[in-house]
Amino acid sequence: EYRLEQDQVHWIATGFLAAMTVGMLLNAWAVARFGSRRAFLLAMAIFIIASLVGGVSNSFGLLVLARVVQGVTAGMIQPHAMITIFQVFPLHKRGQAMGIYGMGVILGPAIAPALGGVLVDVWSWRATFFVVLPACLLAMVIAGRFLPDHREEQAPRLDWAGLILLSLGLVATLWALASGLR
């Protein structure tokens, strides 16, 4: 649809992964600043909006931007799951809970490409953005009802300069690796 070269297409996945790294760094600050429930719900709401934007995008730039926003928010959501496991489960059940969570983390990337291929064959690549929405909405309802809302009295300062420099460094490194010997 967009008539892209291979060195452009990789930014759809690479942008997500690089942004996910940045999101993981933002998570601790967001939880301390807004509370665990609000930080999770905010990240999930933004992820849903980014999924909708990605699914209806009419340009490659907007598609990559949607994936980057998805990556930042997914990076905030993933460690939040581990925090929640430690908050909710008693010590003697944490190993089992982390094992179940870990299975999802491992199986997701193993199953997603095949499922994505089926969705693309049956409908369109846009369906890959919409298929996650019911689970995200369900997660928001459950989190809104049951997620503990721990919040620190004194939220740490976010090192914006460090975060921006890390982000730029990641993009520069990935750009160099993607460009190769061209």
Q: What is each residue range found by the language model?
A:
Residues 121-182:
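Hydrophobic transmembrane-helix bundles of small-molecule transporters
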Residues 1-145:
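Transmembrane-helix bundle of Major Facilitator Superfamily
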